[in-house]
């Protein structure tokens, strides 16, 4: 997987690779220079303790062999925790770094919620659910909704979306069909 631009997500990915590769194994990453390759390489060096680098055609490849002696266990644990869902905004929602608009409500979603009809009912779908903001707001505004199907290309978004839906349902004291 190519390291993402979002720094906390990239650090968590480097930590996951460091934790899963066998001693003596090699971890490699490639990033475009205009996609954060310099900071990606610096973070890679921090977690692995060293790196070899090749830069060509506006890209950078960096790799390192692994050894227990080069890892800082505290840093490894800290960076692994960066991918965990965390409270955002006023604390009503949880999300995780790297998701679209992960720590805010994006303007398009805010516009949709502002114009959401209150008479929605039955089974509804949230296409591109992200961390579940629209689904939760639909539940708050539309008492007739009996089921919600979440569709999201980023699998990492489903855990916070489910947490947010469960929390909203608990606040509203109502169940959904499964």
Which positions does each model-derived feature cover?
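A short helix->loop->beta-strand "cap" motif at the edges of active sites that frequently abuts
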Residues: 23-25, 145-146
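SAM-dependent Rossmann-like transferase core, predominantly class I methyltransferases
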Residues: 57-121
């Amino acid at each position: 997987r190519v390291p993402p631009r979002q720094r906390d997500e990239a650090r968590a990915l480097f930590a996951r690779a460091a934790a899963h590769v066998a001693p003596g194994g090699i971890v490699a990453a490639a990033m475009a220079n205009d996609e954060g390759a310099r900071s990606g390489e610096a973070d890679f060096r921090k977690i692995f303790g060293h790196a070899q680098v090749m830069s060509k055609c506006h890209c950078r490849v960096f790799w390192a062999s692994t050894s227990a002696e080069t890892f800082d266990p505290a840093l490894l644990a800290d960076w692994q925790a960066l991918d965990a869902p965390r409270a955002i905004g006023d604390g009503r929602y949880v999300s995780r770094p790297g998701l679209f608009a992960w720590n805010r409500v994006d303007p398009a979603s805010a516009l949709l919620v502002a114009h959401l009809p209150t008479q929605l009912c039955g089974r509804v779908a949230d296409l591109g659910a992200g961390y579940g903001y629209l689904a939760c707001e639909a539940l708050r505004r539309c008492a007739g909704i009996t089921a919600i199907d979440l569709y999201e290309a980023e699998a990492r978004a489903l855990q916070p979306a489910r947490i947010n839906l469960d929390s909203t349902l608990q606040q509203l004291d109502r169940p959904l069909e499964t």
